[in-house]
Amino acid sequence: MNFSKRKSNFSILSVFATRLGVAALIIAALPGLTNSIARASGAGLDVEVPFEIKALKAPGLVAPYFVQDNHGTMVVSDQAGGVYSVTFAGKATALADKTKIKNPAGVAVGPAGFGSYEGSVFVLAAAGGIKGVCEVERIDKSGAVSTFAKLPDAAATECRDLEFGAANSPFAGKLYAVASGNDSIYTIDASGKASVFGTYTKPVPFELTTITFPPSSDTKAAGMMLVGMRAKGSFAAKVGRIAMVGADGKMKDEVYLVGFIRPSGFAWSPSTFGSYSDELLIADTGKFASENDNMRDGVIVRVEKDLARPFASGLMDPTDMKFIGSKAVICDPAEKGKGQGAIVIISSML
């Protein structure tokens, strides 16, 4: 990937965004990564040294979509159907196969204090067809699947992320579901009651991708929910943004960061992540592979002192990213082509 061109695009956006009174994302000029010794053999994946990147082989998993940590093991939804427990050795075990959950999206693991559901796996899934109404399914420890919550007033939607609110925050004790087709986020309590948390159609309707909660040390967004979004129907390249939403469900006028194509996952690195500990990493899907002749324009950037620096490139359609232990875990449902995805792992070599 030519990051010098990317720098130019972000710089132009910076001027434009400054005039609009929003925080633009500026990408720093760094050496290209294409000659990195950390390139994944034969995969097109590349990451800054001294990190390594690889596509994990997990037989049985077709198109990884969303991921969640379950005590060091990955819980992964598959666009081809089903939800799996996946080890870092690549062993995939069906928690619920595609006959039980046909169209899964976001996944979440019940924390202590969420009713009697600690350890249960929750899945945001489309009922019926892929464009069907989003519901929250629960997989109990025996593998039984039941409908936990139905989203109110949810017409045909596009199911996306599902996250529990951060502990010791205004969002604690609730489950949050993203339905992009409705431009809405829903909140669900331990009884399964769901209500609209916020709908985001102004100044334009937004495609919603993912949500997360910043650490308390983040002075800009402490106590907020961060939401990845992109204006629907927009032809401009770099209008994707990370918005700040308060506990009242209202989106702040000031954005957290802007300058992406489609921000699809973001997380703060742990102290064990080599020389880049405690930094914000952001996955940008770019254009979908089906829209740009399978161009590998998916990237990971890291934010250091308000500068976004290129970190990894060569991904196809990254749709989610989490840190599990000391590793960055990225779902890419088209990493090897349409319907041929992979879990991409980035690790420090230090």
Question: Residues of each region from the PLM?
Answer:
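A short beta-strand motif characteristic of beta-propeller blades
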Residues: V49-P59, K91-K98, A144-D153, K193-T201, ...
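Bacterial N-terminal signal peptides
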Residues: A17-G32
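Blade/loop signatures of beta-propeller domains
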Residues: A40-V49
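A short loop-to-beta-strand structural motif that recurs across blades of beta-propeller domains
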Residues: G82-S85, V133-E137, D183-T187, K238-A243, ...
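Short loop/turn segments that connect beta-strands within beta-propeller blades
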Residues: V86-K91, I139-A144, I188-K193, V245-K250, ...
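Short loop/turn segments immediately following the C-termini of beta-strands
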Residues: D78-Q79, A125-G128, A179-G181, S216, ...
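N-terminal secretory signal peptides that target proteins for export/translocation
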Residues: M1-F16
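Beta-rich, blade/repeat-based domains predominating
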Residues: P59-G72, K100-S120, V133, D153-K174, ...
